[in-house]
Amino acid sequence: MILELDCGNSFIKWRVIHAADAVIEGGGIVDSDQALLAAVAALASVRLTGCRIVSVRSEEETDALCALIAQAFAVQARVAHPAQSMAGVRNGYDDYQRLGMDRWLAALGAFHLAGGACLVIDLGTAAKADFVAADGEHLGGYICPGMPLMRSQLRTHTRRIRYDDASAERALTSLSPGRSTVEAVERGCVLMLQGFARTQLEQARALWGEAFTVFLTGGDAPLVREAVPQARVVPDLVFVGLAMACPLD
């Protein structure tokens, strides 16, 4: 079985799949390396034969995690690295090594699934969009604060904004004008995300008309689903690209 890891800015998304058919044995999201080791070890009858990682962490942090995995499960992790081109997609950055690996792998996965032009909208700690033309040319993209960053900045820099996660969840039962601070903040942030998504859709239509596929991924993808109803929601899109970048027997 293969352990796949997406090490983001705030959390580690993980899953264990069967090597032969990619059937998912287990998975989840954790907030530390130790929590990851415990979660994987808790899977009954799982014997890992390989591990592949995409990480936006520092090289030192990623190496430390690889060492922990080797010690705990006796497998050597393969880490995805930037490339100028791969699987029919050409990296569109002037300095290809500066394109975030999560964005690069999501673009690979989306182009593979779409078989043509595609727009990837990834909503996590940051909100990201990337455009890939029908010939595989990555045209670039956009990055702005995602829901967690917007919320955090308002809480940090505005003294009277204080509320808990349960209140935040209740506030999103609708998007009508907020009648409390928590409703105003949460709904305002969602509307900003939806506006971001709609703008990307307009850009894609200006480029390709209707001849493209939209992909939504990331933990906050459900918040913009109604803004882009034609989108394909693929929570594990980065893992699709990771399997292409780091094939394992």
UniProtKB/Swiss-Prot annotation:
Keyword Metal-binding tagged: yes
GO biological process: coenzyme A biosynthetic process
Cofactor annotation comment: A monovalent cation. Ammonium or potassium.
An example Gene Ontology CC term for this record: cytoplasm
Residues that bind substrate: 93, 100-103, 181
Active site: 102
Single GO MF annotation: metal ion binding
Disulfide linkage: none
Residues that, per the record, bind ATP: 6-13, 125
Keywords assigned: ATP-binding, Coenzyme A biosynthesis, Cytoplasm, Kinase, Metal-binding, Nucleotide-binding, Potassium, Transferase
Function per UniProt: Catalyzes the phosphorylation of pantothenate (Pan), the first step in CoA biosynthesis.
Family: Belongs to the type III pantothenate kinase family.
Protein name: Type III pantothenate kinase
Native source species: Pseudomonas putida (strain GB-1)
Gene name linked to the record: coaX
